[in-house]
């Protein structure tokens, strides 16, 4: 039978393809011999690839042995083999009664397990000791007592939060300021990585540095409500890990406490503050709508405040005071007196959108900053709001009520200043002097204000509330990184400066006039954005940072690496 036109065409295509393949194979063979398909063009040698930064490897720890819980089993499998043919009526009744009792017991156990599971998902409002906070964390023997003794050692001295002089580091002569800036720049640029560790299990959301000058004790809060306590320069436990390079091993000692519950994204620790009275405890606020206090004296975590299903985004405490200010996702700021019952509060809705940050002026606590998703940074004078009567210790003013007070004759000085950014304002903080402000915004800019102290003694709104410096800075962190927030160094004895993570994996330090003082990086050891930063309140050359995987870094003078 003669072939069709289609078959002839198909065979011709196959033949052409085979010839082409054979030709290509010959060219490849020639290239392997001569080094190039075209001898006129010499192949350029590939440049050697730079070694990628390797993340620090967590120490392998033995898992805690937990008690075995009874598992549910099938009734068919648990039933004993019975000869039903020879079974008497009495035996049958007894068997059925036993099976019915077993089924009832099984159902009760199932309902109890479901109830325990429901309770486990709820926030914990009672007092919790270190044993409970440790939970199912894989701790080495004696680690819990080691943490307790470490916290107890901080009680030997009081370290109240210090505030600076509002006129400090304001120079009439620019030469004097240049000398001060140059000296600080030299100290900061000498810093390098001296310690690394995976302090928390999940993404770092917040951090705080304890002011004890002889220690580098840093607190990190993560996405799932875990508080990591890192003694960064403590002698590490001697563990032989042959499969981990010495340079990739963790430094110091750390402990993980499940302070907020449940251990999900609903409990992210939004802010950590060391007790400003004596530094003998830390406060943590979280998305589980609670604020808790961990006492170093007793080792007990207690609830300070709780709200109804509202994300607490930030908090601040003025120096030498028992007051606390909170901000939340509904646009409210809440004032607490920590000496009163936790049900007493004064709350003011000052924005129609989320307030991501609240900051209290350390030298004039009546002036608070709010940074909101509605692009506005505002300075409030809350003295007149405090004078309003609070029946039964509770006062809640909604946005309409606050606006009415602002428009009244008595409320003209409540809002002292306002500045609209191009996009949402991530954060805004007062410096330790209570004079300068730095804001971070999604419009990729850092802005700095200088508020003259004389303006705070007068009642009218500030005549010109305009930033004097604007620094370009990439703040597009996206979904998987913690939002960048410029953080002032709390040390009042040194030229004011602030730290912020950079999307190029460096840590940037700026002076309060906007000068870049240092850009710390280590491409071989850091391969992720250092989104969260904090500085030592008592030692200048100490900065800590954390990333999206819970890995944290201590930056300090390079000579400390060899110690």
Each predicted region: which residue ranges?
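Conserved short-loop catalytic and cofactor-binding motifs
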Residues: 5, 413-416, 474
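Long, repeat-rich segments with strong aromatic
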Residues: 372, 432, 436-442
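Intrinsically disordered terminal extensions that flank WD40 beta-propeller domains
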Residues: 1-204, 558
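Acidic, glycine-rich loop-and-beta core segments that form the ion-binding/anion-interacting portion
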Residues: 362, 368-416
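WD40 beta-propeller repeat fold
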Residues: 139, 143-339, 347-363, 418-420, ...
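A surface-exposed beta-alpha-beta supersecondary segment
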Residues: 396-410, 460-493
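Short acidic alpha-helical/loop segments enriched in Asp/Glu that coordinate divalent cations
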Residues: 391, 451-461
């Amino acid at each position: 039978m003669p072939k069709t036109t289609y078959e002839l065409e198909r065979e011709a295509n196959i033949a052409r393809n085979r010839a082409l393949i054979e030709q290509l194979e010959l060219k490849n063979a020639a290239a392997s011999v001569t080094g190039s398909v075209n001898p006129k063009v010499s192949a350029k040698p590939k440049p050697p690839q730079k070694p990628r930064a390797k993340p620090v490897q967590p120490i392998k720890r033995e898992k805690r042995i937990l008690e075995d819980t009874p598992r549910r089993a099938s009734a068919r499998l648990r039933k004993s083999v019975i000869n039903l043919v020879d079974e008497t009526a009495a035996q049958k009744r007894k068997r059925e009664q036993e099976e019915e009792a077993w089924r009832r017991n099984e159902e009760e156990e199932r309902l109890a397990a479901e109830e325990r599971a429901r309770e486990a998902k709820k926030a914990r409002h009672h007092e919790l000791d270190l044993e409970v906070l440790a939970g199912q964390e894989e701790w080495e023997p004696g680690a819990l007592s080691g943490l307790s003794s470490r916290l107890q050692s901080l009680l030997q001295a009081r370290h109240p939060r210090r505030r600076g002089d509002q006129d400090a580091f304001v120079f009439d002569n620019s030469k004097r300021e240049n000398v001060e800036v140059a000296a600080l720049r030299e100290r900061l640029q000498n810093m390098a990585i001296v310690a690394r560790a995976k302090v928390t299990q999940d993404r770092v959301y917040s951090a705080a540095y304890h002011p004890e000058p002889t220690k580098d004790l840093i607190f990190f809060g993560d996405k799932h409500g875990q508080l990591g306590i890192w003694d960064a320069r403590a002698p590490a436990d001697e563990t032989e890990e042959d499969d981990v390079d010495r340079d990739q091993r963790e430094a110091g000692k750390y402990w993980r406490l499940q302070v907020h519950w449940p251990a999900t994204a609903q409990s992210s620790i939004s802010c950590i503050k060391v007790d400003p009275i004596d530094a003998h405890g830390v406060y943590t606020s979280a998305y589980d709508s609670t604020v808790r206090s961990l006492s170093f004296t007793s080792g007990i975590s207690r609830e300070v405040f709780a709200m109804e299903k509202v994300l607490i985004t930030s908090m601040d405490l003025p120096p030498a005071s028992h007051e606390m200010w909170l901000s939340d996702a509904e646009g409210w700021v809440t004032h607490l007196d920590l000496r009163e019952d936790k049900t007493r509060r004064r709350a003011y809705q000052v924005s129609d959108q989320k307030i991501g940050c609240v900051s209290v002026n350390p030298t004039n606590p009546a002036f608070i900053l709010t940074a909101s998703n509605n692009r506005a940074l505002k300075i409030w004078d809350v003295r007149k709001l405090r004078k309003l009567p609070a029946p039964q210790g509770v006062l809640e003013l909604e946005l309409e009520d606050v606006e009415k007070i602002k428009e009244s004759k008595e409320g003209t000085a409540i809002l002292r200043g306002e500045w609209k950014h191009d996009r949402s304002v991530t954060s805004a903080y007062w410096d330790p002097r209570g004079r300068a402000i730095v804001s971070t915004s999604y419009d990729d800019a850092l802005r700095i204000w200088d508020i003259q102290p004389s303006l705070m003694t007068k009642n009218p709104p500030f005549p010109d509330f305009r930033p004097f410096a604007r620094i370009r800075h990439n703040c597009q962190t996206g979904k998987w990184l913690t939002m960048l927030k410029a953080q002032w160094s709390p040390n009042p004895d040194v030229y004011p400066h602030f730290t912020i993570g950079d999307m190029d994996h460096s840590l940037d330090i700026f002076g309060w006039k906007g000068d870049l003082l240092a850009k710390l990086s280590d491409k071989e050891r850091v391969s992720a954005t250092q989104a969260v930063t904090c500085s030592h309140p008592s030692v200048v050359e100490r900065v800590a940072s954390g990333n999206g995987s819970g890995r944290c870094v201590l930056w300090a003078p390079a000579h400390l690496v060899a110690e």
